């Protein structure tokens, strides 16, 4: 297993831009190794929701921090964005903050793309995955600094060059919820991203073996891939608060089909708020005892995931960071 890293998920759907930057600065002060941000044009819920622009956030946090790694988890470089422009943006940030910037990518959700003008039926997974692979190929070509004539099925460049590129380009982390994309992440990604709370068999029997298989086919060691998981955790010494804090994130407990097909935050919110708190909390590690919390986190480490990014659902993120630094971080680092 690679070196253990502990990261913080900056929830752009829950906090405005200034507060979200301040929270990330706090995360570095509390010893976190990374901070990743979601990239939403629209939030999961209408009331109380936010959606600051992820790239502006990354640039602002980079200017106010010195050490913490920064990235998206995740951005879709294939619909409302042109991948060539995303390549330029991340190259610039990579020059500004050398060795600290990563690009986490995924296949996309209708919630963010339909509102910005995508026309027609939301594409099936096969097309979304094909677009992602093509976008990754194009971005990597542009990060060489060479002139790129690219004539793909979805994207095209003519004599395109990015003039300011960090040495080695920008690490790409590929998000996967199933073995097909996980295999691709093992073959082509610098990192792999998944999310917790979906049954350990998914990670032990499907995702991690697929990452290893993809790496082997590419002649790579799986240890060369940063294996990141967003751990949904509601930890608080007050057990009632730990449970209640999950309510804001009820949309995560909708079915995958609902999350990928609903295009309106108002509709998403209505569907999510109809769920009972017990169902909402199932996606989360809800704990008030630190040893019990770590006991539920440890299986992900045992499965081979080395970069744990913690997503806390409560509105008081400073409280979570204080408790995490005091109660959980020492126990987790002792495991490694």
From Swiss-Prot:
Its EC number is 1.1.98.2. One of its GO terms (molecular function) is coenzyme F420 binding. The active site is at 40 (proton donor), 109 (proton acceptor). Substrate binds at residues 195, 198, 259, 283. Keywords: Carbohydrate metabolism, Oxidoreductase. The keyword Hydrolase does not apply. CDD domains: Tetrahydromethanopterin_reductase (cd01097). It catalyses: oxidized coenzyme F420-(gamma-L-Glu)(n) + D-glucose 6-phosphate + H(+) = 6-phospho-D-glucono-1,5-lactone + reduced coenzyme F420-(gamma-L-Glu)(n). This is F420-dependent glucose-6-phosphate dehydrogenase. NCBIfam families: F420_G6P_DH, F420_G6P_family. One of its GO terms (biological process) is carbohydrate metabolic process. It is an enzyme of class 1 (oxidoreductase). It holds the Pfam family Bac_luciferase. Coenzyme F420-(gamma-Glu)n binds at residues 39, 76, 107-108, 112, 177-178, 180-181. Catalyzes the coenzyme F420-dependent oxidation of glucose 6-phosphate (G6P) to 6-phosphogluconolactone. It comes from the Bacteria. Homodimer. The gene is fgd. Belongs to the F420-dependent glucose-6-phosphate dehydrogenase family. The keyword Glycosyltransferase does not apply.
